[in-house]
Each structure stands twice: as structure tokens, then as C-alpha cells.
Curated annotation (Swiss-Prot):
Residues 685-708, 732-784 are annotated as: Disordered. Zn(2+) 2 binds at residues 87-88, 194, 464. GO terms for molecular function: 5'-3' RNA exonuclease activity; metal ion binding; RNA binding; RNA endonuclease activity. It comes from Neurospora crassa (strain ATCC 24698 / 74-OR23-1A / CBS 708.71 / DSM 1257 / FGSC 987). The gene is ysh-1. Residues 755-766 have a biased composition (Basic and acidic residues). This is Endoribonuclease ysh-1. Residues 767-781 have a biased composition (Acidic residues). The active site is at residue 442.
Amino acid sequence: MASKRKASAMATEPEEPVDPADELMFLNLGGGNEVGRSCHIIQYKGKTVMLDAGQHPAYDGLAALPFFDDFDLSTVDVLLISHFHIDHAASLPYVLAKTNFRGRVFMTHATKAIYKWLIQDSVRVGNTSSNPQSSLVYTEEDHLKTFPMIEAIDYNTTHTISSIRITPYPAGHVLGAAMFLIEIAGLKIFFTGDYSREEDRHLISAKVPKGVKIDVLITESTYGIASHIPRPEREQALMKSITGILNRGGRVLMPVFALGRAQELLLILDEYWGKHAEYQKYPIYYASNLARKCMLVYQTYVGSMNDNIKRLFRERLAESESSGDGAGKGGPWDFRFIRSLKSLDRFEDVGGCVMLASPGMLQNGVSRELLERWAPSEKNGVIITGYSVEGTMAKQLLQEPEQIQAVMSRNIAGARRGPGGDAEKVMIPRRCTVQEFSFAAHVDGVENREFIEEVAAPVVILVHGEVHNMMRLKSKLLSLNATKEHKVKVFSPRNCEELRIPFKTDKVAKVVGKLASIPPSLKEAKTGHDGPLPSSTEPQLITGVLVQNDFKMSLMAPEDLREYAGLTTTTIACKQRLKLSAAGIDLIKWGLEGTFGAVEELPEVKPKLEIVKSENGDTKMEEADEELPHGDDVVAAYLVMGCVTVRYRASGEVELEWEGNMLNDGIADAVMAVLLGIESSPAAVKRSATKNPHTHSPLPADKNPHSHLTPEDRFFRLCMFLEAQFGQDNVSPIVEPKLPPLSPTTKAITSPSEETAKSSDVKSDADADASMDVSEEDEDEQQLKARERAEVERLERMGIPKPGVRIKVDKMEAKVWLEDLEVECANKIFRERVRAVVERAVEVVAPLWG
């Protein structure tokens, strides 16, 4: 019996938190676990890209659209259309005309050319449908009005839109089909759309972009892990089935998309008919309203096709020139045995024929009408050559039902009412044969897996596939992780299921301009060049302006902004003037130094001034008689904090000047506050009110008023500091000093009263007998008091008014002895707290007892 794994072995390692800006958001609005209405959203670093905008061929009206209401389309920057098929492009007119989409739309030139006619034909077919349940979500006018909004681009060209880089590559699915490489902030995302790696007669097969490291691969999973039969065997089986139906006198219906695989099948049939003359009596029709219009597009874009079609083009052109035919004939798309059928009104339904008709899903149009007409005959046959979407008539036919519902025509011979009394439901018996040969131009399981392995992206997102096919491919890809060192993450989100994948990228700034001339640090020098190493090993600091453009960061000096970033810088010089009526230059300097510390005196040009003495002995500065130029009356100028210049003029006007920025503005505000309050400040008034001595001797230097404090003042300030920390009622002075331990020296020191007592003891024996009556306790008490008095006197001589301070908080008590600032307390925590406060108090009141 297998042992059960421990929970610890199954637990995942905790992941570091990720910034939401570093997460890639992926959302399927359509095409998630289904085929049809493909529409995907990718969002990264504030940029949004929409991939495809199709309709579901099995649904009608709004139900066929992607879930546009689940996302704000106004945030989309770029919409990329991979190819012109209905399930990838048919809802684009709705997005452009009916929603708040404001981005730009891109597709290849061939896709745009065919898209115009294909969507226009689709709208017209929908208008002529006899199905009462069908409804159009946009009109032909909407389509033609929004068509100029589409921008066409070429393969292998890179375009930058709103910091998003896109590059289309050939997909090999249909003419103009593209795979897109999308780069956002260094993250490379590759979207395949529908793609094919099979070599066919006219398209270039899909290839992996060379020299590109892809981070996320978004790929189709249409066929899951199923494998296709080799191409020659499929073509042989297809022609055997077609000729078999013709040989029994039947008609062959091949439902195809108007453009895409139909052209490949036409090339196969035209080549086979040219080699087998016995079948040239059977006409081959291409029934599509778009046949002639879109074949011109194919003839135009021969240059974007593969070498086979180019070779055929040269051969046909040479044959045409040798036979003398007019120019423009004999190209690879000028078929010899194919007839274009614009409508069924001109079709004579007599005898055997091969009919390629659109649409490929048999939901409506010419192909559905012919199916309802030919289904009752067992001689006829239907051959499905493309992928059949769930819910469509093509998918139902593969199950070979006994009868089908009439949609295009209800009065056909043999038709009868459906069960249940539903008068609107007309059923037609199906007796024709149904066969399937895959020419869908989608990769099979092997090709898809090889492509994914070749891309080697760490993250793979599967789209465009039915649930069972997608899950099989996902399981196969995950099983390959067993042999890989770096595991691949595979996701298959459903519609409207938001997927978030973290991608952490290093932010690297390129140093340009003058800063680039600074030599690299020691570490860089060791690995960057072979020259001598710099002597300094200190980390190198560089100051500059960091500029981000298109997710690229550059570090440069401010003076290089114009050259390297296209930006201009502006310096704002701010000035402020105020008039002081009483404050002189000395008082202004004193106030600035008291607030900002040392100020730098600037060497400003000073005018000629006279010193005039007033009656009370004050001196003041007066201007000389001669006129001075404007601006030259500056008495003194100072630089505050290295950024604010203060100029004092003879008129009493003070001017402030500084370079405007957030820091300098704050310092200038502080200087203004000092100047506006300097005339009313008590300290300034006291200082300015001092009379100058009537002597010619130099004035004594200004002294700090707090430099000469009495011991009582210092003790008071200490107590005030402690009361602020522990409370006023919890701090009290200690009167009794802390006595040092007794020593012979201490015993020899006695008070004057003790010396008098000793002399009296020597004089008379009677007094000695009386002293013997005194108890030893009284003698010890007197001696203790004498020692305390001596200790207090010693402390006072040192300038310590009180021996100590007692601090009580709740039940805890601490004593602070001021001589050595020793703290006594039974509680260790409280003792350390008191010691820290006392040390801080000493720093504030310091020097405390010096």
C-alpha cells in the first residue's frame, strides 16, 4: 500500500510579496476553453493590449460577442487583429462603433484588405437570413465608418505605441495572418493567434522569432495533442472521396470559409483536374459573393507568399507571354478549371459537380442552402475540410444525424414539420454522406508542442481550444517538466477568469552626459578594464536627475536634460523685502546666529558710511552725502544655511533672495519668521537696550546670560527637568547626606565641640565620671550628626546645595546623589530609567556643578 505523503512535503514555499505593478494580468473575454469569439486582454505596468475581437459562429446577436461588459475598454491602448476570420475579427466594428474604446487598431495590409469585404459580406448575409432569431449587432454603415480607423503594418517591422512595442510575424494560417511579439517595460509576450507550421502551396509557415527571449507565450490549443495525417496522404484521401462521389453521379459540397483554406483547396483541385482529364467534364464552382473581389487581393499580395506560389507565378507568366495572351493573365490565381459563382440564381443544378461554398460552419448562406437542397439524396456527399466549432451545423453533421433543420428554405420536397407541434421547425432528412479531412491550417499536438519547446518561455497560456483538447495539451506540457531544470508554468484560464502572474524586473538606469565621464567604482574597475585600480575603495555616489521614458531610465546632470531628454529646466529666483524700523545689522546677525548657527558674511560692495554718535552714546550708520547708484546701498550681506541671502540696506530695508525649491522655501520662511519677530523678542529687546560704556576701550565680548548660574539655580533646573519626567509630587530633595564609611582618618576628624569636650575630660575626674553616664547610643547619634554636618559643609563648598534627590513612582523609590550622580534603587529597570533621565538632565543643565 502506498504511503501517505506528509503535509510538509506538499506545502509550497512562501512567496515574497509582489508589487501589483509587477504583475501581468491576463483575461479572456472570449476564446477561453472554447473555440470562437477570440478576445484576450493583457495588462502590465499600466499598459493594456487587446488581442483579437471575434464572434462565436454558433451564436447570434449579442450572445455571439465576447464578454465586453466585464472589462473597461476605454483603458485599452492597442488592439491587435491576428487575421480576418469571423471568430477573430467580426466584432471589431462593434468595438469601434458601440463601445468606449479609444485605442488604436492594427492588422497587416492583407488582413485589412480582405477584412473590409469579408465583414461587409457577413452583414449582408445576416440581413438576408430567414432565421427569425438572428439579429445584427452592427450595420454595414458602422463597418464602413470605422474601417478608416484601422492601421495596417508589415511583417517583421517594429512599431512603438504608447511605450508598447509590437512586431508582427507570419503565422501561416491564412493570407495576412500574423503572430505578434509585444514588449512592455522589457517583458516580452508572444501571441500566436491561429498558426500553422505545415508547408502548403501558397503560405509561409510560422517560425519562432530569432534572437528573442520570450517571457510569456500565448498559443492556441485547437487540436490538443491530436496528430494530423501527413499532407500527401490527406490530399490523396480527399481526392479519392471527391472522385468517388462524382463517379456515383452525385454532387460534392465542401463548406469552407470564403477566404483562407478555400484558396489552398482550389490550388489542389485545379492541379488535380489538370492532371486527370477524365474529371474535367465535372465543373468546380467557388460559390462566394467575395470570390472575385478577394481573389484580386490574393493576386496583389503574391510577394508575401511562399516560394511555391512565386515559382508558379513566374511559370504562368512565361506561358502567357509565349502564347501572346494579354498582360495580367496566367497568374497563379487564374484557375483553369475553377468557375466563380456569384449567386445560386445562375447555377444550373444538373449533373455532378464540386461546390466550394461559404460559410464553413453551415450556419447560413450559400453552403447552408445547398446542404438543405442536397442532403436528401444519398448520391451526394458533404466533405468537411476545416475545424468545426461546437454548436454549429458542421459539428452536428459529423455525428451523421437522420435529419437536419431547415433554415434557408422551408418548402423543400421531402421536408416535414418537427415533433412537438412547432410550426416554425421544419426538418429535412439527411441521406448524403459526410466525411472529414482536416485542412484547417492549425498546428496539431506534435507541432504545437515542438513550437512551445522551441520558444522556451517560462510561462505558457493556452487559448482557442475546447476544454478536453486544452486539458490534454496542458497535462502533456506539465509532464515534460519532470526532465527540466526550470519548470514551465502552464495556464488555461476560462472566460472572464482573471489571471495574475508576477514578473520582477531589475530597474537599470543608464548614466549619460557629464555623469558618464565619472570613473567607475573599484568593483566595476576590476571587471570592466585592465588598467590600474583606483586607490579609493569607498562606495561611489552619483547625484543627478533620473528620467524615465518608455520604461527606460537615464541618469544625467540637470544641464544635460535638454540634449538627452529633450527637457528644459527653469530656475526661479525668489525675493522678499521687509522694512525694520529699529533693528540694526548687529541685532539681525545676532538673531540669525541664534537660530541657524554660524552665518556666512558675503563680500558685498558697501557704500561709504559715516559713524554718528547719538546723545545717549548709541552709534548708528548714516549714508554719505554723495549719491550712490541704486542697489549699492547694501550695508552687509549674509548667507544663511548656504541658500538664503540676507541683505541689509542703509535705509533699514532687509532683502531676502533664494533659489526657489521645496527646501529653500522652508528655510526662507524660517528666516522671515526670525526677522519679523526680532524687534519684539524679549531677548532681543534686552540685548538692544544695553547701554554702551562711555569709554574708548574695546567692548567686552557678549556673554551668554546662562553661563554664570548659582548652585541653587542649577539645582532648581535639575529638579524642574526631573519633575517634567516623573511628576512634580514625585521629586523631592534629600537633606541627609550619604556618609562615607568610617576610617582612621575619618575618626581623627572631629568637630570643635568634640575637642572642647575632650579638654574638659582631661581637666577633672568628676566630669569624666559624668560623661561615663552618657549612653553609647547618644554618643553614636551625636557623632553621626557631626559627620552629617561636616559632609553637608563639604558639599556646599563644592557648589552642591543639596546632597541628593529622591524620586518616588508608585512603590518604587530611587535616590540620586548629586556629587557623583549615583542612583540607588532596588528595582533594576527603574534604576536604569532614572539614570538615563539624570544623564540627559546633566547634558541640558551642564556643566552642572563645574
